[in-house]
Amino acid sequence: MTGENGILTRANDAKANTEQAEEDELRKLTQAEAATYLEEHEYTDVSGETITIPAKCAVSQVEGENTLAGGLVIIDANGNEWVWIEVPESITASSTTDEDIKNALISYATNYRSDYSDTWYEGCGLEEQEYADRYSEMLQSIKANNGFFVGRYEVGSFDNPVTGNDITRKAVIQKGAYPYNWVTCSQAEDLAEGLATGGKTSTLMFGIQWDLVMKYLETKGVSESELKTNSGSWGNYRDVEFQVEQGNKYAISTNWRLGEWNDIPANYTKPTFNTDGDGVLLTTRKELILNLLKKLYLLSIKMYNQSP
């Protein structure tokens, strides 16, 4: 009765499917609500904290996704999901110039900075002056708004996966999408810009923003070592084994060549691999986040106020 095909197992599966269906319905309702917001609007959570939400976006109605303390999720009118990365007001309070703001942010997230610098290079998808302008806008916006939004999932597409360069597929930030691969950096920048909504600016993430995401996760209880040294307890790495729920899709990579996509079978455990280029690629679903990044999956783009 309690085996793979037992009554209890089937009852648990039915419960999980019902809960997932209810959650999916709440996301659809939030998406519909987002379409009604033609301008920016204020949102105050249960603890009294207030944040400005972009036009064409609404705060998720799913339990646990509607507080700043827990990790605020918004859904836009296209169904894409974004997470708020808070930067405490005190960090940039005494900074006014771009250089001052940048240095303050670097100091705040210094444990994740290493020796990297945010430097323009040809082929990144932006011209040098455009890069400088966007970087300045980003810094000033973080100061004005005390944070920024990032895509909740890796950028993907519901169109059929490809084995070569093809940027005609519609890009989304939603669970269940195929990862958007086979693109150059400049093409990825174009796709990221196309995901902007509510009059905001969307680009690939600048280095300092990745550092700030890591710092944000640290403030939510993730240890520095898990973020910097060994993230195998929550990441999809070739040498890490973990359970993957049904409803996902997977494809095996062998010597850097991706095979066919298939549905995840029942009781599937992602195996370990010993060689670079071998592994499993998975569609973007919340269940794959395991036990740490319950709000953030793979981060690749961010959205901020263009004119704070």
Predicted ranges, named:
Residues 14-38:
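N-terminal alpha-helical signal peptides/signal-anchor transmembrane segments
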Residues 1-12:
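C-terminal juxtamembrane segment of a hydrophobic transmembrane alpha-helix
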Residues 97-110:
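Short Gly/aromatic-enriched secondary-structure transition segments
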Residues 91-99, 157-163:
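Short, solvent-exposed loop/turn elements at domain surfaces
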Residues 88-92, 153-157, 209, 304-305:
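Acidic glycine-/aspartate-rich tracts in secreted/extracellular proteins
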Residues 38-95, 202:
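GGW-centered surface loops in extracellular recognition modules
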Residues 293, 299-301, 307-308:
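Low-complexity Ser/Thr/Gly/Asn-rich repetitive segments
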Residues 78, 108-297:
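Short aromatic-cysteine micro-motif
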